[in-house]
Every structure is written in C-alpha cells, then in structure tokens.
C-alpha cells in the first residue's frame, strides 16, 4: 500500500511543477508493451457539443489506451496542455468520480474527487488499493473552435475503472523458480485489441523481465541479450490466425546464449505456458538465431513437452487428504480415517501439520497446555509413516509450510520466521529468515505463513489481513521476506487461515458469518465463496488446484464442484466429521 500512496503523492507533487513542465522527451514504457497498433474502436473521442463534465469523463476513459503516448486521451487536450502533460509512470485507477466546477464563459476550473481502486504500472502490473484520492490540483478547460478542451491537468494518468475493465485483459507471464522445477506466475494486464498481436506482446514482456518484486526470486531464461527477431506469426509464417485452430505460433529469437538442454527446455516452458494460458494454441515453433531451439522439436513444441513444469500441476496429489483428528494424524481411506503409521499417528496434542510437496514427509506442531501462560509448542519433522524428530520449540509455532527444497517454514512466537532443514548429519538446522521488511510495514503477530507452491512467495495472516511477500535468497544463501503488500482490502480484518490453491489464487477462512470463505489473487482482488452448509466458526483451510477443505464447527467439509443443479456447495467428508478435526494437505 505504501507504494500505491507513493504514486498518489508523486502525482500530487507533480501538479505544483506542471506550470513549468516542458515537453517530455520520452514517455514511460507503455502499460501494454511495445506493440504498435490502432486505438480500440470503443474509445471515446471529443465532439464540439460536449459539456465540460462529459468531456472530462470521456477523457478519463480514453486514458485506458496508452498507445503512442496516450494519443487517444491527448485528443481532449489543447496543444499546449498536450505538450506539457507527462504521462509517465503508473496510472491510478479511480471510480465514483465527482467534478466540482467553477464556470466562466470561456474557461472552467474543476476539482476532481474520486475513490482509488488500484494502480497500473507501466509494465502492466495491477495492484488493488483503497481510500480517497488526494486532491491532485485544479483541472482547467477552455473553449476552443472545436469545443471545450482541457488546458491544464496534473501530470500522471488517472484511469476510469469501468473503462479499464472493458479495455484490459488479464494475462499471465511465467518465469522459472530458483530450483528449475516449475514456472512462477506474474499476472499482467494487456490491452491488445488485435488478437494476432497478443503473442508478440506477451513474448516481448517475457524478454523485458519480471515485475520488480520478483527480480531476485525467479530466473528469466529469456532475459538480455536475447531479443525477438520479429513479430510472432503462425507456425507457417502467416500473420493472421496466430495461435488459433491448428495454426500454431512461431517465435524467432536471436542472441541466445543458453546452451545446456535443460535451460533451453525451461526457456521453452516460459514461452509455452505464457502463450498456452492466454489461449494461444500450439504447436509452438521456437527458433533461435535461425535454428530450432531444440532439434527434437523442429515441427514445434506442445504443452505436453514441458508438462514437468506445468504451473497447475500438484506434485503431492498422490498423498491424498490427511487430517488431525483428536490430536493425531489420520489419512482418508474411503469411508475410514485410520491413524497413519509411525510418530505422527501416535503422538497426541498435534495442533497443526503439513505434508511435504513430494508427499513423502510430514511436519506437525505439538502444543502442551494451550492458552496457558506456560504453553509450549514443538515442531516435529520426519517421514510420513515413520519416526519423527523434534526440530524446534517455542511458546507458539505457526502451522508449518514446506518449500520445494524440503525446508519447513514456521513462525516462532508470532514474530520470528525460521526455516528448518536437515544438515549433512541429518540433524535439523534452524536458520532465521529476515522478516524485517514485513514487521516494518505490517507490525503485529504473524498468525499464519504459507509458502506458494513454487516457493517464491509467502502469504501471511497479520492482524486478520492477508499480507503477501516475496521470498528472496540473499547472496550469502540466507532468505528474506521482501516487498510486503496487503491483498484483499475487501476482506477487512476478518481472516483466520489461508492456503494457496494455485500459484495465483489464495483461499482464506474468515470470522465473517456471511462470507466465511473467500478467495484473493496476486493482484489483491478478492471474491466470496459459497457459505451454504458451513457451521461457524470456520478455522483451518487447506487447498489444492482441484479442491478446497475447511474445518468448521462439525469437522472437515470440502467444496464440491458446480453441478447442473447449481453452484458449488460444501459437503461433509464423513470420516472426518468430528469436531476439532482439521484438514492436512501437501504444502
């Protein structure tokens, strides 16, 4: 949120300087990238009979298209205003705009009031926000021979929310996680009206790189000095029908420095999943410096050729659903829920647990004297079905979360984030994680911390809010939580528990009886899940790409998919319908 307000105050500050602003010699990178294209036909244009109020509203709609330095919006400006208006940087998305006018026969001075709903960076990164727009300063209109035109306005861009929704489409870029195991989502908003140019736009964005907070958390195999030789075409070189039907897509790259086969496969995975998830179908013919990227795929790649990196894959799915029932770990076996073998099935007083990403190991927190002044919590880690070893202790420990490298992350006493790994001798090593940026921006106890499935992000519950941070490995091999920001302003301070459903989608349980389960994505946009057949309180949530489980007052229930009869509903997991039982999944 602090970055959003920084954008606001920069815009406000810019008003003071706008009187002496010169013609900007360059514009910021277009929010939709570098593709040259005509303005979308739906954008408004000024007409001689427009009233000043109407002209201003149409101007805000026209700012939705940044092509050619917001040429569509500049049609609403006088020549001098167009020369001095600096459209660089992020745009503020506003709604419920009110104009307060002071009129003279030939000039109108306007003060604008609005609600902030978010910001859109020059890379196409959207983040939600909230609050009233600080007064950006006066906007002045003058009567010209062509009708009213804006003669003075603040620097920066204010974007009408409704027009943004109708002009921009959300697409996802994919970069590589540090282990080279999977790809990591980076959602962007793109306003390309010509579908044949979308593939070029997305590949260009891949080459430009990830959003700033991901720069030190992912790898980009398409980074400099790699470039795109020309527009993406059909597989046969045609310029229309790119990625539609069986036409496929052809991507010609140059300056490739990657030589090893695995890195080339990861490069292909970035392109393929980015285009595939945007509805641009294969085969994907990928050439580098005039030759096939991989001689095995001269006729093109399919998504199945990079299935190992599928961002929707769930590696631990075979482990199935587990639960903590009466303090011990059980597994779901048809209509039975027997205790698992080994320590996790025998130990009492387990309050939270998680299965490893591989489904082979487990971690659980045992709590003695819960709620008492001398409460004690211990973390146990070991093979699922085998013998566990104590790894950590504290007064309180959060629900454990596994990373891709089989480290277990927990929060000790609500403040200290710790990463537990096995050292060379097999003993647990406890390594502190730098959570200083989180504590500085969002002070308060961390009630939960869950790593994304790709391990590059951490979602936390702090003060009933969802806080997202990047997981960054430092040069010394340590880890830090950086770039914290709040997600889901509409959730208030009601969040109890959270779980990653996919790399871009978080499920939360809440104290709100009207909306006990909600969703929030990486942009911060939240929506409500069904509430029918849930008994408050709803506590622990566990999720994977296909299913959501929550613990309510009766036991564990799962979200059943939509049927012909209606919307998704919560159904009982019969063997786990014991009060106090909580769901456990890999993650």
Curated annotation (Swiss-Prot):
Membrane-spanning intervals of the chain: none
Keyword Signal on entry: yes
Residues carrying lipid (S-diacylglycerol cysteine): 20
Membrane topology: Lipid-anchor
UniProt biased composition (Pro residues): 38-47
GO cellular component, one term: plasma membrane
Lipid moiety-binding region (N-palmitoyl cysteine): 20
Alphabetical UniProt keywords: Cell membrane, Lipoprotein, Membrane, Palmitate, Signal
Pfam families: Germane, Gmad1
Region (Disordered): 26-47
UniProt-annotated location(s): Cell membrane
Recorded coiled-coil stretches: none
Endpoints of the signal sequence: 1-19
PROSITE patterns (UniProt xref): PROKAR_LIPOPROTEIN
NCBIfam families linked: PRK13616.1
Homology family: Belongs to the LpqB lipoprotein family.
Protein name listed in UniProt: Lipoprotein LpqB
Organism: Mycobacterium sp. (strain MCS)
């Amino acid at each position: 949120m602090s970055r959003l307000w920084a954008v606001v105050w920069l815009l406000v500050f810019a008003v003071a300087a706008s009187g002496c602003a010169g013609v900007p010699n360059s514009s910021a990178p277009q929010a939709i990238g570098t593709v040259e294209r005509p303005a979308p036909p739906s954008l408004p244009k000024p007409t001689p009979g427009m009233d000043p109020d109407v002209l201003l509203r149409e101007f805000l709609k026209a700012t939705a298209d940044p092509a050619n330095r917001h040429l569509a919006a500049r049609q609403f400006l006088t020549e001098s205003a167009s020369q001095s208006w600096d459209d660089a940087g992020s745009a503020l998305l506003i709604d419920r705009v009110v104009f307060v006018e002071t009129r003279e026969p030939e000039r109108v001075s306007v003060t604008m009031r609005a609600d902030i709903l978010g910001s859109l960076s020059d890379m196409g990164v959207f983040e939600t926000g909230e609050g009233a727009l600080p007064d950006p300063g006066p906007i002045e209109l003058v009567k010209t021979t062509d009708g009213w035109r804006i003669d003075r306005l603040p620097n920066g861009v204010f974007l009408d929310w409704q027009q943004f929704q109708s002009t921009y489409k959300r697409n996802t870029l994919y970069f590589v996680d540090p282990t080279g195991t999977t790809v990591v989502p980076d959602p962007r908003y793109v306003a390309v009206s010509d579908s044949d140019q979308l593939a070029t736009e997305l590949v260009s964005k891949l080459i430009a790189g990830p959003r700033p907070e991901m720069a030190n958390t992912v790898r980009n195999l398409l980074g400099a000095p790699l470039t795109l030789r020309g527009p993406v075409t059909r597989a046969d070189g045609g310029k229309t029908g790119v990625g539609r039907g069986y036409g496929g897509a052809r991507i010609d790259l140059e300056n490739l420095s990657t030589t090893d086969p695995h890195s080339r496969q990861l490069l292909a995975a970035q392109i393929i999943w980015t285009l595939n998830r945007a509805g641009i179908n294969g085969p994907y013919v990928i050439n580098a410096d005039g030759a096939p990227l991989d001689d095995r795929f001269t006729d093109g790649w399919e998504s199945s050729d990079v299935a190992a990196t599928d961002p929707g894959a769930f590696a631990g799915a075979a482990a199935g659903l587990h639960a903590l029932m009466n303090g011990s770990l059980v597994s779901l076996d048809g209509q039975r829920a027997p205790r698992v073998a080994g320590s996790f099935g025998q130990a009492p007083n387990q309050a939270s647990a998680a299965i490893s990403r591989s489904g082979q190991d487990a971690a659980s927190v045992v709590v003695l004297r819960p709620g008492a002044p001398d409460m004690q919590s211990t973390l146990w880690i070991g093979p699922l079905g085998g013998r566990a070893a104590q790894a950590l202790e504290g007064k309180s420990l959060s629900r454990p979360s596994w990373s891709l490298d089989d480290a277990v992350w927990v929060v000790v006493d609500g403040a200290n984030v710790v990463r537990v790994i096995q050292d060379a001798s097999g003993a647990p090593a406890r390594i502190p994680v730098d959570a200083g940026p989180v504590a500085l921006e969002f002070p308060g106890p961390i009630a939960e911390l869950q790593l994304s499935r790709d391990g590059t992000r951490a979602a936390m519950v702090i003060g009933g809010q969802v806080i997202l941070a990047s997981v960054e490995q430092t040069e010394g091999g340590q880890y830090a939580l950086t770039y914290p920001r709040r997600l889901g302003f509409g959730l208030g301070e009601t969040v109890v528990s959270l779980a990653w459903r996919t790399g871009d989608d978080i499920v939360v349980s809440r104290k709100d009886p009207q909306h006990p389960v909600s969703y929030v994505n990486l942009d911060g946009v939240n929506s409500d899940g069904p509430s029918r057949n849930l008994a408050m309180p709803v506590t622990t949530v566990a999720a994977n790409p296909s299913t959501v489980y929550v613990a309510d007052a009766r036991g564990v229930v799962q979200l059943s998919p939509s049927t012909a009869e209606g919307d998704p509903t919560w159904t009982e997991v019969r063997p786990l319908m014991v009060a106090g039982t909580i769901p456990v999944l890999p993650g």
